[in-house]
Curated annotation (Swiss-Prot):
Protein name: Nitrate/nitrite transporter NrtP
Localization of this protein: Cell inner membrane
Entry's transmembrane regions: 19-39, 52-72, 79-99, 109-129, 150-170, 195-215, 240-260, 266-286, 382-404, 409-431, 445-465, 485-505
Coiled coil: none
Swiss-Prot/TrEMBL induction comment: Transcribed in nitrate-grown cells, but not in cells grown on urea or ammonia. Transcription is probably controlled by the global nitrogen regulator NtcA.
Organism: Picosynechococcus sp. (strain ATCC 27264 / PCC 7002 / PR-6)
Record's keyword terms, sorted: Cell inner membrane, Cell membrane, Membrane, Nitrate assimilation, Transmembrane, Transmembrane helix, Transport
Disruption phenotype: Mutant can still grow on nitrate, but it has a lower capacity for nitrate utilization, which limits the growth of the cells. Mutant cannot consume nitrite as rapidly as the wild type cells at pH 10.
Gene Ontology molecular-function annotations: nitrate transmembrane transporter activity; nitrite transmembrane transporter activity
Function noted in UniProt: High-efficiency transport system for both nitrate and nitrite.
Keyword Transport: yes
InterPro entries tied to this protein: MFS (IPR011701), MFS_dom (IPR020846), MFS_trans_sf (IPR036259), NO3_transporter (IPR044772), NO3_transporter_NarK/NarU-like (IPR004737)
UniProt similarity note: Belongs to the major facilitator superfamily. Nitrate/nitrite porter (TC 2.A.1.8) family.
Main location (coarse class): membrane
Length: 534
């Protein structure tokens, strides 16, 4: 596969167009952080309000990934991805034209739906690549697409300067200093963050239209397998139904945590908070009803699945936990890493940002590397275990980083830790498409949603540690203690999940097969020469 990867024909065309769709969705999703301080000046926001906007950016991604997974299984990735990219222009324009804090929050809440785009490509890539190559293909899709967040961080300010001549530019009053990567520092007094954010949404919408007319859901002659109903996840045993309901509960609880944070910054009053909690309880009950509707015949004894048609929901649950500790921790660490290096080593903001960017840069190699290792090592289970152990140990080592350490050693440790984190993400989604093919979208949606559960949970832990430290030290938190505790939480939870994987994760059936289950050579993806016209 690696030898043909740079081709733009057949399955490789689909792979490249799909990872770029994911890349654009992440550029749009993360177009706020580069302008955070500028927007704070423009609107007079405090740190709590900025933090709330950041949390809102990931909040609706949790239910969105579930819903997108259902729509994906029913309507196919081509239509679903195209419409999501076109939709991305809406929250971008709302945010870019905002005149109040509440409008900013609304824009970022709606933007969280765009973050669900990752799920769509998982199924698209799985349809075009056989099981033996799916880890590498999904790793390339995830790793290269994920780089959109780093690209946004490096380029949005440049776009804001280039577009300064357009209406809506913010004038600092005096030149502000900016530094991007290793380029020389530059000064500007005018930055058009509104035009830059609106522009990314428009670009995403245009690519959404191009994507629709350039790809297909499956290779020629291959059937797109759909579930009987997309209202809820199908399970194949009665005990798995109750397990499914239990694993759906944290998805609702984490949204309650967000509602609590919104109340703390006065976005919601007491009545609004109570209404939000009741609405979330209603959402969980509605989701439960839909799951019952889909699985009613099974639960009432009218239907039994043949052994070869069953899957174990416990395998989905384990993968959800792995994505909490790998992708969830990545999102949380990316948020705090610049401040960590700045405070620990007394660096300026620009230098700390450059060093912290090494964590995101690793995505280009690490996530595909995790998928490749999973494809080549002969056991997807033990690949997952080893990478998750490495991640846990890496975080525990990072908890001991202090200002007395050589900076180069700290940077190397950060990069090594990020390799295990992102390779574990690649390993997770090397398994996801192999659990139950016809509901791959819903499985990917649930697993992906748990990544956001992890991000919100870990960021909340960091916030609580900071507040506790501030309370114990007369109002000023001791960030060295806070950061050490935070990395210890990441490391310990990672090792716990690695232990669970070692005992409960099973090797997927047909992990390294030439064809998907139920396919033959005639219905599988044809050779690249035959696909060249597609």
């Amino acid at each position: 596969m690696l030898g043909e990867m740079w081709s733009f024909n057949g399955r490789y065309k689909i792979l490249h167009m799909t990872w770029f769709a994911f890349f654009l969705s992440f550029v749009v999703w993360f177009n706020f952080p580069p302008f955070a301080t500028t927007i704070a000046q423009d609107f007079g926001l405090d740190k709590a309000q900025l933090g709330t906007i950041g949390l809102c950016n990931v909040a609706l991604t949790v239910p969105a990934r579930i819903i997108i997974g259902m729509l994906l299984d029913k309507y196919g990735p081509r239509l679903t991805y195209s419409l999501l990219l076109i939709y991305a222009a809406v929250p971008c324009l709302i945010f870019a034209t905002a005149q109040s804090f509440n409008q900013l929050v609304l824009g970022r809440l709606l933007m969280g739906i765009v973050g669900a785009g990752f799920v769509i490509g998982i199924r698209m890539v799985a349809e075009w690549f056989p099981p033996k190559d799916v880890g590498t293909a999904e790793g390339i899709y995830g790793g290269w697409g994920n780089f959109g967040s780093a690209f946004s961080a490096f380029t949005m300010v440049i776009f804001g300067i280039i577009l300064a001549f357009l209406p809506g530019a913010f004038n600092f009053g005096q030149p502000e200093s900016f530094k991007i990567l290793f380029f020389p520092e530059f000064n500007t007094a005018i930055l058009n963050w509104r035009a830059a954010i609106a522009g990314t949404g428009i670009i995403a919408a245009l690519y959404g239209m191009l994507y629709y007319f350039s790809v297909s859901d499956t290779p020629p002659g291959k059937t797109y397998h759909r579930p009987k109903s997309a209202r809820g996840m199908e399970v194949t045993t009665k005990k798995d139904f109750w397990f499914l309901l239990a694993m759906n509960l944290p998805l609702t609880l984490i949204l309650m945590v967000l509602a609590w944070r919104l109340q703390k910054v006065n976005f919601l009053n007491g009545t609004g908070f109570a209404i939000a909690i009741l609405a979330l309880v209603g959402l969980y009950l509605f989701q439960t009803y839909n799951c019952w509707t889909v699985n009613k015949d099974l639960m009432t004894g009218k239907k039994r699945y043949a052994p070869e048609d069953r899957y174990e929901f416990s395998q989905v649950a384990i993968l959800e936990l792995t994505y909490i500790v790998n992708f969830g921790s990545e999102l949380a660490v990316v948020t705090m890493l610049p401040a960590f290096f700045e405070g620990t080593f007394s660096l300026d903001k620009a230098t700390a940002g450059i060093i912290a960017s090494s964590y995101a840069f690793m995505n280009l190699m690490s996530r595909p590397g995790g998928g490749l290792i999973s494809d080549k090592m002969g056991s997807r289970k033990w690949t997952m275990v080893v990478l998750t152990v490495g991640m846990g140990v890496g975080y525990l080592l990072m908890s001991s980083v202090a200002g007395t350490w050589p900076l180069a050693i700290a940077v190397l440790l950060t990069m090594a830790c990020s390799f295990f984190v992102q390779a574990a993400e690649g390993s997770t989604f090397a398994i996801v498409p192999l659990v139950k093919r016809r509901i791959t979208g819903q499985i990917a949606g649930n697993v992906g949603a748990y990544g956001n559960v992890g991000a919100v949970a870990y960021l909340t832990v960091l916030l609580l540690l900071t507040e506790a430290s501030a309370g114990a030290n007369g109002g000023e938190p001791v960030m060295a203690t806070v950061n050490a505790g935070f990395f210890q939480v990441l490391g310990i939870t990672g090792l716990i999940v690695a232990f669970l994987c070692a005992f409960f994760l099973k090797e997927p059936k047909g992990s390294f097969a030439e064809f998907h289950e139920g396919e033959t050579e005639m219905t599988a993806t044809p050779p690249i020469e035959e696909e060249a016209t597609y």
